[in-house]
Amino acid sequence: MQLLKDKFGRVHDYIRISVTDRCNLRCVYCMPEEGLTFLPHEKVLSKDEIVSFMELMVKFGIKKVRITGGEPLLRTDIVEIVRGLGAIPEIEDISITTNAMYLAKKAEALKEAGLTRVNISLDSLHADRFKAITRGGRLQKVLDGIQKAEEVGLFPIKLNVVLIKGQNDDEITDFLRFTKDKDINIRFIEYMPIGHAGTSWKEKYLPLDTIFEACNEAGYEYEPVDSIRGNGPSENFRIKGAKGTFGVIHPVSAHFCDSCNRLRLTADGYIKACLYWDEEMNIRPFIQDPVKLMQLVQKAIDNKPENHEMALKLQDEVQSNKPTWRRMSQIGG
């Protein structure tokens, strides 16, 4: 089997497929309050295109798929997409990232179709604050979605918490306490300058050392834990005696580019080899032309930078030669 390897020796076996750029929320770190101009439906990859693409990609070593958006559960055919991917025997793991507004309704059907596990965005445990950060989200719907995911066996369940200075950084201990009674992995993620103009993001950025300081202040003893299924770049820990775990993902202060194994496919059919790099290859016209398609995929990988240059300098400045122009919802979170 010919593997997808870049010039730095990184083998790519994981792809994140955005199935829509649409979302029913407007999270402050993902989309402007006024929203975005969404792709016309005919510009979005169809179920058959997604499945055909993956039937080819598995021949080159891709074996893990994460479905993203926008909000992927807005796709009326999301269960059929999962079922189509689940029918490809070489795919070992199918996961989804969701805001969970519709997860309670769809979790059982998704599990039956072949979904392995779920990541859920949850940036506050206070209903009013959650509504403010998401610009309209209902916390109880997320909690119901978590419960349903537990019931149907979508494990491990991971909760993605973007740490935002002045908005939810006083809830760190609450999230840590959440892991004591639930077998859930809470992942604290640094606020990233994706698609943001200027340097205003720095006003909301907090280094993740804050998490460990909160543990110490609360008197929580914690220890590293072994790899969690699909853990990716997260460094994971467990508070002694807790059922669940917590992790930290720091793409800004300590990037993990040297071990990056992922590609991204946008909802409109562009391959991105790096989240924070503008270069994209339009593969949609060639989904039925495997030779040309794989030439483009390999070209994207060949041009992948050694790192995304989003690391902080001493003065907390971002160095970036080619920052991405897309918002996170347009790339696939």
Curated annotation (Swiss-Prot):
InterPro entries: Aldolase_TIM (IPR013785), Elp3/MiaA/NifB-like_rSAM (IPR006638), MoaA (IPR013483), MoaA_NifB_PqqE_Fe-S-bd_CS (IPR000385), MoaA_twitch (IPR010505), MoCo_biosynth_MoaA/MoaC (IPR050105), rSAM (IPR007197). The keyword Iron applies. Its cofactor is [4Fe-4S] cluster. This is GTP 3',8-cyclase. GO terms for biological process: Mo-molybdopterin cofactor biosynthetic process. One of its GO terms (molecular function) is cyclic pyranopterin monophosphate synthase activity. It catalyses: GTP + AH2 + S-adenosyl-L-methionine = (8S)-3',8-cyclo-7,8-dihydroguanosine 5'-triphosphate + 5'-deoxyadenosine + L-methionine + A + H(+). Binds 2 [4Fe-4S] clusters. Binds 1 [4Fe-4S] cluster coordinated with 3 cysteines and an exchangeable S-adenosyl-L-methionine and 1 [4Fe-4S] cluster coordinated with 3 cysteines and the GTP-derived substrate. [4Fe-4S] cluster 2 binds at C257, C260, C274. GTP binds at R16, R66, T97, K158, R262, L263, R264. The gene is moaA. Belongs to the radical SAM superfamily. MoaA family. Monomer and homodimer. CDD domains: Radical_SAM, Twitch_MoaA.
